Regions:
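Short alpha-helical transmembrane segments in multi-pass integral membrane proteins
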Residues: 1-20, 78-143, 187-241, 297-364, ...
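Residue-level signal for short hydrophobic patches within transmembrane helices
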Residues: 9, 13-32, 36, 59-66, ...
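Interfacial/gating helices of multi-pass transporter permease domains
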Residues: 18, 41-61, 127-132, 192-193, ...
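Transmembrane helical elements of multi-pass membrane transporters/channels
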Residues: 18-37, 139, 173, 202-206, ...
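Helix-terminus/linker motif at the lipid-water interface of multi-pass membrane proteins
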Residues: 28, 32-50, 120-127, 183-190, ...
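Small-residue-rich hydrophobic transmembrane alpha-helices
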Residues: 50-110, 147-166, 271-335, 369-383, ...
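Hydrophobic transmembrane alpha-helices of multi-pass small-molecule transporters
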Residues: 62-65, 177-181, 206-211, 281-284, ...
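Short runs within selected transmembrane alpha-helices of multi-pass transporters and secretion channels
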Residues: 71, 140-158, 166-174, 195-208, ...
Length: 448
């Protein structure tokens, strides 16, 4: 057995831990991009500039989730063929997806750049931060193809059991981003534009190096393959489209929630934006475990080692419980200090109250998010996308309905009160579907 095949040979808990830890660290450093922007802008420019950057977060997440969802479709098939040692089909999927998604990313970037002001206006962005928010967003969309390509390549690496290379690249680009943020924002005084430009350059460097390293990595599997295969593209889209719909629709929902928050004013938005950054950091621990479970399940399914799938699921749940406890302790003891990193000295009492209340509420219920993500990861790995999509839509419906109906009448707290209820409902639906779909040793749910 090759050392690349440890996901189908090592003990499930050991394999998932080894595989997931670089992904968790990588996800953390990916969030450092946005955190560096927010902290440095908040400290050196002010809370209004922080609100401008934060106002873009919900919209940029929609486009990021399109990239992540597209990567899921390719990643599940790459893992399946890798586990089955069908390297010809694996390389065909890799080439087909890179060509297709490169074109898509350019089109999406051009669309986002051209309609930045319209989209921010539709979100009811406060007038005093609208121009800065649009500027940040337009610079972001110039670099969107780099971000899209990096996310696709990162999924490819993890699909073949390699999670350390994306980690190394992210550490490098994150450090580069922080230094350029400090130079452009603090020294040159470029404000929001400097923060966006620093992120663009760092993401571009990461994408280029990822592409070159991945090309070199693929030389290990010497076989004939097709540069573009329409049939394989259709198979990939069968998995990718539900995932894109799920991820982008949830982000659109969060964008609608952002529109609910905006009328509460710039300071409330600053507090909300600060905690959204913190939520992204902690939630990525659970997202990474879910993302690690998918290739684990898919590789073992491709290798016809279906008895290992349920053991891997239990191992993922154990990891989620540990991380939920860690998140609770950190938030409960340090929530004020964490808020001050983003809000700085000119953050008002309202901004600190919104940030602290939202953050502590999340800390109590992160366990629901963890078990939801692990269950969703198994469904993706098995290619069972319909219940996965339905469960996430129910999650979104709960969050949106409470925010839209109750927040304008009874206060901003209702924006986050329904979050854990949505996570729990999502888990229950996904788990019910999973119990009916466990493969056995005689059944293989391969996509063919």
């Amino acid at each position: 057995m090759s050392k690349d095949e440890y996901l189908i040979t090592d003990k499930p808990l050991k394999a998932l831990t080894i595989f997931a830890m670089p992904m968790i660290l990588g996800s953390f450093f990916q969030q450092v991009y946005n955190m560096a922007d927010s902290i440095i802008v908040g400290q050196f420019v002010g809370s209004s500039a922080l609100a401008a950057v934060g106002a873009c977060a919900a919209l940029t997440n929609v486009f990021i989730c399109v990239a992540l969802g597209a990567g899921v479709g390719a990643g599940v098939l790459v893992s399946r063929y890798f586990g089955a040692r069908n390297y010809s089909k694996m390389k065909t999927i890799v080439s087909t997806s890179l060509i297709s998604f490169c074109v898509l990313s350019i089109l999406l970037g051009a669309f986002g750049f051209g309609f930045s002001r319209l989209m921010m206006s539709l979100l009811q962005t406060p007038a005093d931060i609208l121009d800065e928010a649009v500027l940040y967003l337009q610079v972001y969309f110039v670099g969107f193809p780099f971000l899209f390509m990096y996310n696709i390549l990162s999924t490819m690496f993890t699909s073949i059991g390699e999670s350390k290379i994306p980690l190394g690249l992210l550490i490098f680009s994150s450090v580069l981003n922080i230094f350029m943020d400090l130079w452009m924002v603090a020294d040159l005084g470029l404000g929001v534009f400097g923060a966006a430009l620093a992120t663009l350059i760092a993401q571009g460097v990461s994408a280029v190096f990822s592409f070159l390293i991945f090309l070199y990595r693929m030389r290990r599997y010497k076989c004939r393959y097709r540069w573009f295969d329409r049939q394989e593209l259709q198979l990939m889209l069968r998995i990718a489209i539900p995932s894109v719909l799920q991820q982008s629709t949830v982000s659109i929902g969060m964008m609608i929630v952002q529109a609910v928050v905006n009328p509460f004013g710039t300071q409330a938005l600053a507090g909300y934006a600060a905690t959204m950054r913190v939520e992204n950091v902690f939630s990525l621990m659970f997202v990474s475990i879910g993302n690690a479970v998918s290739p684990y399940v898919s590789q073992n399914l491709g290798a016809n080692k279906t008895s290992r799938i349920k053991k891997g699921y239990c191992a993922a749940l154990l990891l989620d419980i540990c991380f939920a406890a860690f998140a609770f302790i950190v938030i409960e003891t340090l929530h004020t200090q964490i808020s001050s990193l983003f809000l700085g000295k000119d953050g008002t009492a309202l901004a600190y109250q919104v940030s602290g209340d939202y953050m502590r509420w999340l800390g109590y219920f992160f366990i629901f998010m963890g078990i939801k993500m692990a269950t969703d990861g198994v469904l993706r790995g098995l290619g069972i996308m319909r219940p996965f999509l339905i469960a996430n839509m129910v999650n979104l419906a709960i969050r949106l309905s409470v925010a839209l109906i109750f927040a304008p009448r009874f206060g901003i707290a209702f924006v986050w009160l329904a979050v854990p209820a949505g996570w729990l409902a999502n888990f229950l639906i996904s788990y019910a579907a999973l119990r009916k779909s466990w493969p056995n040793d005689e059944t293989e749910r391969a996509v063919s």
